[in-house]
Design a protein with these regions (language model features):
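Active-site helix of classical SDR
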Residues: 125, 161, 169
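Short, small/polar-rich loop/turn modules that mediate ligand/substrate recognition or access, typified
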Residues: 84, 177, 182, 237-239, ...
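Conserved glycine-rich cofactor-binding loop
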Residues: 9, 16-18
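Catalytic Tyr-X3-Lys loop
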Residues: 103-122, 137, 141, 158, ...
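Residue(s) in the substrate-gating loop at a strand-loop-helix junction
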Residues: 145
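Substrate-binding pocket helix/loop in short-chain dehydrogenase/reductase
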Residues: 94, 100-102, 106-114, 196, ...
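Alpha-helical segment proximal to the catalytic Tyr-Lys
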Residues: 130, 174-178, 235
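Short C-terminal tail/terminal secondary-structure segment
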Residues: 99, 150, 209, 227, ...
Length: 251
C-alpha cells in the first residue's frame, strides 16, 4: 500500500479536535499507532480516541501543555515506554489567534505565539531526537499556515511566529538530514473547524471566493499531506512547505 505507516508511532499535539484530529485520523488510517495530545478538552480527546479505536487503530491519549518543557518530556518518555519508539512528530497545538491592529497587542501575547510555534517544536524535537537518531529514521512535520505567505494584516504576532516556525524547520531539515530525519511543514489555508464556529459568514464567503479549486479545505486534506511527508515515499523530501489551500498561493 502506498504511503503505508504500518508499525510507525505518531504523536500529534493539539489533536483532540479540528485540524489535529484530522491529522491523527489520517495517520491512523495509513497504519500508524496514534498518540493524541490535549490540554483542557478531555471530552473531545476521548471522543477522538474512541473514533480511532472504532476504526481499528491502535491509539492512546496524553495530557500535556505544549508550551511546558517538563510536561512535554514526560509525555514523550511515556509514549516511548508504551510503544517502544516515536517515529513521527506533528507539532500542531495552537492558542487563540485574534486579529487586531499591532497597537492592540502586548508583548506577552507575542511571546505566547512564539512559545507555541517555535519553542514547542524545539522542545519536542529535543525530546524525540535521541530515539530518531538511534533508529536513523524520523519525520517531523510542523503545521504552519498560509498567513506567512499571504502577509495577512492585523495578524502580525501569528504571522511572525509562523515565519519563525518555517525558518526553524528549514534549518533543522539541513541539520538532521544526515541522520535520516526529515523536517517539513504543512501550511493550511482557512479551514473551518470548531475554532471558527463564530467567524462572520460574510468573511467566510469572501474567503471562499479566493480559493481557485472552489471549495473549502478539510482537516482530512491536511492529514493527507502529513501522511505523505511521514511516508517512506517522501524520504528524499525535506525542508519544504506544502500549502494546502486550494491554490491560493501558487508560488
Amino acid at each position: 500500500m502506498p504511503f503505508s505507516l504500518s508499525n510507525k508511532v505518531a504523536l500529534v499535539t493539539g489533536s483532540s479536535r479540528g485540524l489535529g484530529r484530522g491529522v491523527a485520523m489520517a495517520l491512523g488510517k495509513a497504519g500508524a499507532k496514534v498518540c493524541l495530545n490535549y490540554l483542557n478538552n478531555s471530552e473531545a480527546a476521548e471522543k477522538t480516541l474512541q473514533d480511532l479505536r472504532d476504526e481499528g487503530i491502535h491509539a492512546a491519549m496524553f495530557r500535556a501543555d505544549a508550551s511546558d518543557q517538563s510536561q512535554l518530556n514526560f509525555m514523550v518518555e511515556a509514549i516511548e515506554d508504551k510503544f517502544g519508539s516515536l517515529d513521527i512528530l506533528v507539532p500542531n497545538a495552537t492558542p487563540d489567534q485574534p486579529q487586531k491592529p499591532i497597537e492592540d497587542y502586548d508583548a506577552d501575547f507575542y511571546r505566547q505565539m512564539y512559545d507555541f510555534f517555535v519553542m514547542s517544536p524545539f522542545m519536542l524535537a529535543q525530546a524525540v531526537l535521541p530515539g530518531m537518531k538511534k533508529r536513523k529514521r524520523g519525520r517531523i512535520i510542523n503545521i504552519t499556515s498560509e498567513v506567512f505567505h499571504c502577509s495577512v494584516p492585523e495578524f502580525s504576532a501569528y504571522v511572525a511566529a509562523k515565519g519563525g516556525q518555517i525558518g526553524w524547520s528549514r534549518s533543522m531539515a539541513n541539520e538532521l538530514a544526515p541522520f535520516g530525519i526529515t523536517v517539513n511543514t504543512v501550511a493550511p489555508g482557512w479551514i473551518p473547524t470548531e475554532r471558527h464556529e463564530n467567524d462572520p459568514e460574510d468573511a467566510k464567503n469572501e474567503y471562499l471566493k479566493t480559493i481557485p479549486i472552489g471549495r473549502w479545505g478539510t482537516p482530512e486534506d491536511v492529514g493527507n499531506a502529513v501522511v505523505y511527508y511521514s511516508s517512506d515515499e517522501a524520504s528524499f523530501v525535506t525542508g519544504q512547505t506544502l500549502c494546502v489551500n486550494g491554490g491560493r498561493t501558487p508560488w
